[in-house]
Amino acid sequence: MEKIKCPKCNSIMQEFDIKPKKASKYEDCIRRCIQCQIGASNAKINPTFIYKDYRNNIPSNLLEHLDETLEKTLNTANRENKKIKLGFSTSEDAVSWIFIKYFLVNDKLPVLQKILNLEDEISEILMWGVSQINCDSGCTEKLKHICDSLGEDKKYYTEPDIIIITKSESVFVEVKVKSGNDKQAADNRNYDKYLLDKFYTDIEAAKKSSYYELIRNWTIGNIFAENNFKLINLAPQKLFSNENQDSDFKLFINSLKDSRNFIQLSWEAVFKNLKKSNIEEYFYNELEKRIF
């Protein structure tokens, strides 16, 4: 296999004599830096770096409350796997946490408010369904109640990447970095619980679109907000360029009531606004290396 340098200490990774397979965790990696506890996935081209300890994939000054949050995420069945995946250099969850936590730790929520084009100041943020500003806000329990009322399995509650609340609106943010929006076959019976007439102009079109992840967020978000809801799809521009040419995606958009409240926000636009703000270079670089 190709020799790989450790991204931390720059030394050549040691190769282990183990059977090659898709690396789902550090121990599966043939190439590893034992000193730094970082492995390279077994892909022949552009391997993903996998940290044995997921915390080492997050800047140390942004680790506050990460462990507590991970212990409370709504999808309880996925908690341990979520920790492992946070250790991947390609992790969308890592990007989501770094992006939001920077503004929280550095008291820069007005900058985030501007980037997301929110009218009012931010009063609460939830990461994977867990409150980050006011633990007594009741928002987590409200979200659980909605998932329960829709008939979701208690072990697999939907946990939106990011929820941002102001006095006038609730905003769900679905974060994408390398992959597209999740699609599932239209014959999946799980669709039915989310396809409520009051949120869609054409239920069959929504189902046929196969955009299962966005449909779940659209329905749960509308119920959560009660009024003034937005769903932001935060992703690289190339994802939107591809999906906007997809007939299934057009079906999804056209099936939504108040489709203007579904917003495509590119990472490129976010970076443009970050450059105009008083943002530390390390934060900009952390996001850039993971997204582009």
Feature roles, as predicted:
Residues 1-292:
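Charged, terminal alpha-helix-loop-beta segments
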